[in-house]
Every structure is written in structure tokens, then in C-alpha cells.
Amino acid sequence: EDHDEMVIVKDVDIFSLCEHHKVPSTGKISIGYIPNRRVVGLSKLARIAEMFSRRLQVQERLTKQVATALMEILQPQGVAVVVECSHLCMVMRG
């Protein structure tokens, strides 16, 4: 079955460790894509985000890795990824 409607999963909780300071960052990720016939369940989008966020990570790379993985796996018409995190390394240092 062909699908071409935008698919969005919003505000998925993510947890990571800052690769520079080894302290936690927590936040939310929202992922959207426009299918090119292929769709996956919403839980798969959350799993992809979780997989990348479990690594020592910076927020910018996490965002790019999730978007790139979806582009490679699903080959959609387009992908959008928004990550908003609170970084303990910034909170602790002021």
C-alpha cells in the first residue's frame, strides 16, 4: 500500500551523555518524514532516536544521525528532526 501523507512523532524522551564532559543531557526529539511508499511504525522512529542517543553524543550530531538514518532506510521525500535538550554540563558550569 502506498503512503504519501506526512508522518510525525513528537516529544519522544531521549537521554544521552555529553561526549566532552561525560555528564547527562535529557530532552525531547520530534521526527517527521514524508514517505515515498515506505512507512514504519511510530515506535521504530523512537527506537532509532534511542539508539543514537545512547552513545556519547553532541546534540548536533544526534540530530544529523537520526535524519541520515531515516533517509537511508526509508528513502522518503523529506525528513525533519528537531532535538531540544537540557545539558547538565551547561547547567553545572553556569
From Swiss-Prot:
<dbReference type="GO" id="GO:0006729">
    <property type="term" value="P:tetrahydrobiopterin biosynthetic process"/>
</dbReference>
<dbReference type="GO" id="GO:0046654">
    <property type="term" value="P:tetrahydrofolate biosynthetic process"/>
</dbReference>
<keyword id="KW-0862">Zinc</keyword>
<comment type="similarity">
    <text>Belongs to the GTP cyclohydrolase I family.</text>
</comment>
<dbReference type="InterPro" id="IPR020602">
    <property type="entry name" value="GTP_CycHdrlase_I_dom"/>
</dbReference>
<dbReference type="GO" id="GO:0046656">
    <property type="term" value="P:folic acid biosynthetic process"/>
</dbReference>
<dbReference type="InterPro" id="IPR043133">
    <property type="entry name" value="GTP-CH-I_C/QueF"/>
</dbReference>
<comment type="subunit">
    <text>Toroid-shaped homodecamer, composed of two pentamers of five dimers.</text>
</comment>
<keyword id="KW-0342">GTP-binding</keyword>
<feature type="binding site">
    <location>
        <position position="21"/>
    </location>
    <ligand>
        <name>Zn(2+)</name>
    </ligand>
</feature>
<protein>
    <recommendedName>
        <fullName>GTP cyclohydrolase 1</fullName>
        <ecNumber>3.5.4.16</ecNumber>
    </recommendedName>
</protein>
<dbReference type="GO" id="GO:0008270">
    <property type="term" value="F:zinc ion binding"/>
</dbReference>
<keyword id="KW-0289">Folate biosynthesis</keyword>
<dbReference type="GO" id="GO:0005737">
    <property type="term" value="C:cytoplasm"/>
</dbReference>
<keyword id="KW-0378">Hydrolase</keyword>
<dbReference type="GO" id="GO:0005525">
    <property type="term" value="F:GTP binding"/>
</dbReference>
<dbReference type="InterPro" id="IPR001474">
    <property type="entry name" value="GTP_CycHdrlase_I"/>
</dbReference>
<feature type="binding site">
    <location>
        <position position="18"/>
    </location>
    <ligand>
        <name>Zn(2+)</name>
    </ligand>
</feature>
<dbReference type="Pfam" id="PF01227">
    <property type="entry name" value="GTP_cyclohydroI"/>
</dbReference>
<keyword id="KW-0479">Metal-binding</keyword>
<keyword id="KW-0547">Nucleotide-binding</keyword>
<dbReference type="GO" id="GO:0003934">
    <property type="term" value="F:GTP cyclohydrolase I activity"/>
</dbReference>
<feature type="binding site">
    <location>
        <position position="89"/>
    </location>
    <ligand>
        <name>Zn(2+)</name>
    </ligand>
</feature>
<keyword id="KW-0021">Allosteric enzyme</keyword>
<dbReference type="InterPro" id="IPR018234">
    <property type="entry name" value="GTP_CycHdrlase_I_CS"/>
</dbReference>
<comment type="function">
    <text>GTP cyclohydrolase 1 is the first enzyme in the biosynthetic pathway leading to folic acid.</text>
</comment>
<comment type="pathway">
    <text>Cofactor biosynthesis; 7,8-dihydroneopterin triphosphate biosynthesis; 7,8-dihydroneopterin triphosphate from GTP: step 1/1.</text>
</comment>
